[in-house]
Amino acid sequence: MTSTTAARTASSRVGATTLLTIVVLALAWFVGFASRLFAIVRFESIIHEFDPWFNYRATHHMVQHGFYKFLNWFDERAWYPLGRIVGGTVYPGLMVTSGLIHWILDSLNFHVHIREVCVFLAPTFSGLTAIATYLLTKELWSPGAGLFAACFIAISPGYTSRSVAGSYDNEGIAIFALQFTYYLWVKSLKTGSIMWASLCALSYFYMVSAWGGYVFIINLIPLHALALIIMGRYSSRLFVSYTSFYCLATILSMQVPFVGFQPVRTSEHMPAFGVFGLLQIVALMHYARNRITRQQFMTLFVGGLTILGALSVVVYFALVWGGYVAPFSGRFYSLWDTGYAKIHIPIIASVSEHQPTTWVSFFFDLHITAAVFPVGLWYCIKKVNDERVFIILYAVSAVYFAGVMVRLMLTLTPAVCVLAGIGFSYTFEKYLKDEETKERSSSQSGTTKDEKLYDKAAKNVKSRNANDGDESGVSSNVRTIISIILVIFLLMFVVHATYVTSNAYSHPSVVLQSSTNNGDRIIMDDFREAYHWLRENTADDARVMSWWDYGYQIAGMANRTTLVDNNTWNNSHIALVGKAMSSNESAAYEIMTELDVDYILVIFGGVIGYSGDDINKFLWMVRIAQGEHPKDIREENYFTSTGEYSTGAGASETMLNCLMYKMSYYRFGETRVGYNQAGGFDRTRGYVIGKKDITLEYIEEAYTTENWLVRIYKRKKLPNRPTVKSEEATIPIKGKKATQGKNKKGVIRPAPTASKA
């Protein structure tokens, strides 16, 4: 009877725990989804930023024409006159995922536009990311820690920044694939099962198809295997898991057209292959260990490892030298040397996401989890095992990379949420332990302890306290106060995450918002206004020149041909556009004529104080152009005499006469941005411009938006017979005037007449 009651009690507890887990995960999914809809509520269902516009355009093309034609799609509206082969230059996982969801909904007679699927894809996947994080943390620590981690990542600003509604980018689905791949890797390592390793390889294949950050996975998992070997934790489970995963993952990843043979021909993938080979050697050594003497084993191990290691290094450098294996890319070098990209590849350094992360960003995106994260890391180090070595390596490497590049804050956030969940869970378990359970367990062993002497009892109590932890000597009031403080911190995290998501990460870049003194909202829709004008008032084959930041938006919203866009695959072509922007009007006209440019688009924020305009980006245009055309463009020529970058009174003549300056400030000298400001006062820079009377000779103003944010100019077509100016009409005759001889004066002879014979 007692055993039956105990079984029923245990079964009811398991059922209640399962129900609670499902409810918490469902709430985390719902809260994560709802908190990402601020942009939809305030504005409308619209695609955000820059890259998402190309992703949406590519997805729309795939849904209309099919996947096969998508892979063979040649985009003639990009990179004129070169064009772009889309299928072999994109990660198709995002498009395939959206297309599959759209097909399923359409099959169920839920007819929605593909744009709505794209807008709501990232918020939907945030719930899947929370579940994947729960599964990973559960394998690493406990179900309670998993629930904490799932709730953290559901609303963490570090992840929300790339997954709000409308942010249709690769990261929206890639973080789910990242966490799920890590979960399957830990599961396969714990079980040593080929099935889990195969599932891990399939999840990795999805990650490869979705985001270029898959390189982080294919280097972190080998690093984990190498660390286990060095720590003496080699096992057959590790051999089966890694060998199965690496072979399948490499073959599957090569099926993505954009990746191709990179897994076997690039340096970024060679560490994984090296660990694979090392694992075979270690397995062979373990096999031979019980079959030869210890001295023979040490000789074979040390000698064989040294020879094979040296041979591997020689073979690698020979393959790189011979061109069979590509060296490390510039982006890889920029992770180890933050100044490398600025000197050698300015196009990489010009991207704001590639800048180093400030200290404020860590606390802004992570809040209290950044402070608790080291606690969870310490708990994992204190109670280390095979799988916890993985999260330790993940955390340390992610912290470093996030400090080097602000974009990689996205890869740090999952690790922080996992370790913060472990930290909070373990702390709450310590300070909220059931007192009745402790008293019951102590009373069962109390009868034998009462018979012992006081000094013996004191020693036993001391040893028990040492085993249970320091919290045993803490009173219930102190435990209650600490628990309340932790709950307050968690509530503060929720408030902070909601505030940051609402005010910092839920504003589409194509729609700007400001407020008046009395709090009324002002919506500035200049971007879409300009793109709509281009779509309605220019020829279908018109070519638009702009800086590469706006290429995807022009192609997506205006449906016009661009010279460069956000793909940035051709540095020399971008440098040519930068040279045109940096040159004087006549030199720029020659470049634009060669490129068949019809319209030029620039972003100017001097009227409304928009800091992300082209004048503030102009130095990057100069640097990129200088890299390809050092004889024509020199960065120092655009500085003042004191070495400052300015468009004000002290600006250099080169700066005042360049095409970018003229297009930005044309007619601006006549404009007053405030009652107490002089004409030509630039709100963004905070001073009056250096040259107000700007005239244009080779281009003409075509359209300027309401708030002067977007300005469009048209390249003039020069006439075949140029008009001669009046002051140049008199042609001077050089040479001496004849004053002597029979040729002194001219003689007019009568015209010859024809007579009939």
UniProtKB/Swiss-Prot annotation:
The record marks 162 as: Important for catalytic activity. Residues 35-121, 161-171, 209-210, 262-269, 321-358, 405-408, 496-757 are lumenal. Gene3D superfamilies: 3.40.50.12610. GO terms for biological process: post-translational protein modification; protein N-linked glycosylation; protein N-linked glycosylation via asparagine. Glycans are attached at residues 559, 566, 570, 584. A motif (DXD motif 2) lies at residues 169-171. A motif (SVSE motif) lies at residues 350-353. Dolichyl diphosphooligosaccharide binds at residues 407, 552. The keyword Glycoprotein applies. Its EC number is 2.4.99.18. Residues 721-757 are annotated as: Disordered. A motif (WWDYG motif) lies at residues 547-551. It is a multi-pass membrane protein. Mn(2+) binds at residues 51, 169, 171. Catalytic subunit of the oligosaccharyl transferase (OST) complex that catalyzes the initial transfer of a defined glycan (Glc(3)Man(9)GlcNAc(2) in eukaryotes) from the lipid carrier dolichol-pyrophosphate to an asparagine residue within an Asn-X-Ser/Thr consensus motif in nascent polypeptide chains, the first step in protein N-glycosylation. N-glycosylation occurs cotranslationally and the complex associates with the Sec61 complex at the channel-forming translocon complex that mediates protein translocation across the endoplasmic reticulum (ER). Despite low primary sequence conservation between eukaryotic catalytic subunits and bacterial and archaeal single subunit OSTs (ssOST), structural comparison revealed several common motifs at spatially equivalent positions, like the DXD motif 1 on the external loop 1 and the DXD motif 2 on the external loop 2 involved in binding of the metal ion cofactor and the carboxamide group of the acceptor asparagine, the conserved Glu residue of the TIXE/SVSE motif on the external loop 5 involved in catalysis, as well as the WWDYG and the DK/MI motifs in the globular domain that define the binding pocket for the +2 Ser/Thr of the acceptor sequon. This is Dolichyl-diphosphooligosaccharide--protein glycosyltransferase subunit stt-3. It comes from Caenorhabditis elegans. The lineage of its organism: Eukaryota, Metazoa, Ecdysozoa, Nematoda, Chromadorea.
